[in-house]
């Protein structure tokens, strides 16, 4: 048995080295010990229209008697299209039991994206522009989640009345929490306007590991002194209801002028309701650590906060 595991481990290491050599920076190590990896796959166009992130975990039985545990991360990939792609990957495994199949999986996904890009329907960029044009007359800032990027970078649409550009605020990173191979980590920044929210998200996604997280849930609360109201919003990023729960926690703690992003790297084992507990615990811990639960104004000043800008108020969620 030990010899079998040793052989599987050697074959896995050889395949991992080969994937890193072939795909370079597109191949990302999420957890080297748990053997969790991801790769960003595009349709091979100079300006990619469709992209997808394949996340895999290699069990000890792979490639001998078990397939990789995988997840397809792309907000646009749903329903029948997702089922068909998953079926094609499973067919590759069934035809190659006992063999290394990661390369075949990646290229199969790439072929599917290339075929999709050749269809005449508008790509995600065109669809997003149409949606923005429909709400162009609204005054409130709007959070857009472009479906074309599987590593989830957001493009915040800012109204014409938004404040002048603010500098990037400092970003703090909390201690990670790991449970059954899933890892959660919170990131915090003081913010006083939507432009800073945008800058913080962009800066976080420059980090390849954060960008490849299965979910990046976030919420922010900005106090508008002139109106004595809050500008606040949240994003689930595929983890249903997680953003709203995070925002509710921030409301209960009565924090102001701060945003929290919680990254989750899925480890292949479902956690059930425990995942929400870990998300909120990560957020609470970093808010307490940075003193936002005591005196939000003084805490923000310790980060070098600027004077509150007068943003338009967005409806609470």
Curated annotation (Swiss-Prot):
Q: What cellular component GO annotations does this protein have?
A: cytoplasm
Q: Which domain of life is it from?
A: Eukaryota
Query: Where is it mainly found?
Result: cytoplasm
Report the PANTHER family cross-referenced here: IMPACT-RELATED, PROTEIN IMPACT
What is the annotated signal peptide range for this record?
none
Q: Where is the composition biased (Basic residues)?
A: 303-317
The protein's matches in Gene3D superfamilies, at most eight in alphabetical order, are given as: Impact, N-terminal domain (3.30.230.30), Ubiquitin Conjugating Enzyme (3.10.110.10)
Q: Which gene encodes it?
A: Impact
Checking InterPro entries in the record gives: Impact, Impact_N, Impact_N_sf, Ribosomal_Su5_D2-typ_SF, RWD_dom, UBQ-conjugating_enzyme/RWD, UPF0029_Impact_CS
Domain RWD, chain residue ranges per copy: 14-116
**Which parts of the sequence are annotated with region: Disordered?**
117-151, 295-317
What CDD domains does the record tag this protein with?
RWD_IMPACT (cd23821)
- Pfam families from the UniProt entry: RWD, UPF0029
**Protein's UniProt name:** Protein IMPACT
Any GO molecular function: actin binding
Question: Where is it located?
Answer: Cytoplasm
Q: How does it assemble?
A: Interacts with GCN1; prevents the interaction of GCN1 with EIF2AK4/GCN2 and inhibits EIF2AK4/GCN2 kinase activity. Interaction with RPL39; this interaction occurs in a GCN1-independent manner. Associates with ribosomes; this interaction occurs in a GCN1-independent manner. Associates with actin; this interaction occurs in a GCN1-independent manner.
Phosphoserine-modified residues are 295
List the GO biological process terms.
Answer: cellular response to amino acid starvation; GCN2-mediated signaling; intracellular signal transduction; negative regulation of transcription by RNA polymerase II; neuron projection extension; positive regulation of neuron differentiation; regulation of cytoplasmic translational initiation in response to stress; regulation of translational initiation
Question: What family does the database annotate?
Answer: Belongs to the IMPACT family.
For this chain, the annotated S-S bridges are: none
The species this protein belongs to is Rattus norvegicus
Per its database record, what is this protein's job? Translational regulator that ensures constant high levels of translation upon a variety of stress conditions, such as amino acid starvation, UV-C irradiation, proteasome inhibitor treatment and glucose deprivation. Plays a role as a negative regulator of the EIF2AK4/GCN2 kinase activity; impairs GCN1-mediated EIF2AK4/GCN2 activation, and hence EIF2AK4/GCN2-mediated eIF-2-alpha phosphorylation and subsequent down-regulation of protein synthesis.
**Alphabetical UniProt keywords:** Actin-binding, Cytoplasm, Differentiation, Neurogenesis, Phosphoprotein, Repressor, Stress response, Translation regulation
- Give residue spans, biased composition: Acidic residues: 132-141
């Amino acid at each position: 048995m030990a010899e079998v595991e040793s052989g599987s481990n050697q074959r896995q290491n050889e395949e991992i080295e080969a994937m890193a050599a072939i795909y370079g920076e597109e191949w990302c190590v999420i957890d080297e010990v748990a053997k969790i990896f991801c790769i960003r796959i595009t349709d091979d166009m100079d300006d990619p229209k469709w992209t997808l992130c394949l996340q895999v975990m290699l069990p000890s039985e792979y490639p001998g008697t078990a397939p990789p545990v995988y997840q397809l991360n792309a907000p646009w990939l749903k329903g029948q299209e997702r089922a068909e792609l998953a079926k094609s990957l499973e067919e590759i495994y069934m035809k190659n039991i006992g063999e290394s199949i990661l390369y075949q999986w990646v290229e199969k996904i790439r072929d599917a994206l290339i075929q999709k890009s050749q269809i005449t329907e508008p790509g995600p960029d065109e669809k997003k522009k149409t949606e923005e044009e429909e709400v162009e007359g609204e005054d409130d800032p709007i959070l857009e989640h472009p479906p074309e990027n599987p590593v989830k970078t957001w493009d915040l649409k800012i109204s014409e009345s938004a404040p002048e550009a603010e500098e990037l605020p400092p970003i703090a990173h909390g201690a990670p929490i790991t449970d059954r191979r899933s890892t959660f980590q919170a990131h915090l920044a003081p913010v006083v306007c939507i432009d800073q929210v945008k800058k913080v998200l962009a800066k976080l996604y420059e980090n390849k590991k954060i960008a490849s997280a299965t979910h990046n849930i976030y919420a922010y609360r900005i106090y508008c002194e002139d109106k004595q109201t809050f500008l606040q919003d949240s994003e689930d990023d595929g983890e249903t209801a997680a953003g709203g729960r995070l925002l509710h926690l921030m409301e209960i703690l009565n924090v102001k002028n701060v945003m929290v992003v919680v990254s989750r790297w899925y480890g292949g084992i479902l956690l059930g309701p425990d995942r929400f507990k870990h998300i909120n615990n990560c957020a609470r811990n970093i808010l307490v650590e940075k003193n936002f639960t005591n005196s939000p104004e003084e805490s923000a000043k310790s980060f070098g906060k600027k004077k509150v800008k007068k943003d338009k108020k967005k409806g609470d969620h």
